[in-house]
Amino acid sequence: MSVWISLIGIGEEGLDGLAPALKTLIDDADVLVGGERHLAKVPGGDAERLGYDNGFGAGLDEIESRRDRKVVVLASGDPMNYGIGAMLSRRFGIDDMEIHPAPGAFSLAAARMGWSLPDCETLTVHGRPADVLNLHMSPGTRLLVLCRDGDSPAEAAALLSERGYGDSQVTVLEHLGGDNENRF
């Protein structure tokens, strides 16, 4: 089987951050799959649109039913790092797809903090309970935590305090790589 799924990582800058060849893949797609915020970054076009804001697993059958078409799946940043890339490759096989990652949240956050990624613990509480952080808290550890919403940083800070790390510096970064990038 030839490649029929193109998995494209996009950043906050949307289409402006993509190489021309990736924009062409999106323009030529028969089916465009993504979360609401991903699809909103691609205005217009004639492609059928499939959203997956309520969980991606159920969308796999929808994608499978379009095997005879050019399918582009949009994801945040690097879809192979806590993203949907592994789920897609397990289901469809790497021979059916091509993966085009963009800089992910961890790379961008490490760059903003001036930290080397190998010197950090990278974790996500997106779709996971915040107490997963407990396994990684130790003196001097640098944690880069991908959060699910605006409440997650406060939950992480509360866990730090409960574990005796109340003096830790917590930096919140949002909309990395976009016009609304912010640091708190």
Identify the function of each model-found stretch.
Residues 1-108, 126-137:
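Class I S-adenosyl-L-methionine
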Residues 2-7, 20-23, 69-71, 138-184:
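A contiguous loop/helix-start segment that scaffolds small-molecule binding in enzyme catalytic cores
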Residues 86, 90, 111, 158, ...:
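Short, well-ordered alpha-helices that flank and scaffold nucleotide-derived cofactor binding pockets
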Residues 90, 115-118, 136-142:
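Acidic/polar active-site rim loop that often engages polyanionic ligands
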Residues 92-97, 115-119, 163-168:
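A short alpha->loop->secondary-structure connector
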Residues 96, 119-124, 140-148:
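Flexible, glycine/proline-enriched loop segments at strand-loop-helix junctions
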Residues 107-115, 180-184:
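Glycine-rich, charge-decorated loop segments at or immediately adjacent to ligand/cofactor-binding or catalytic sites
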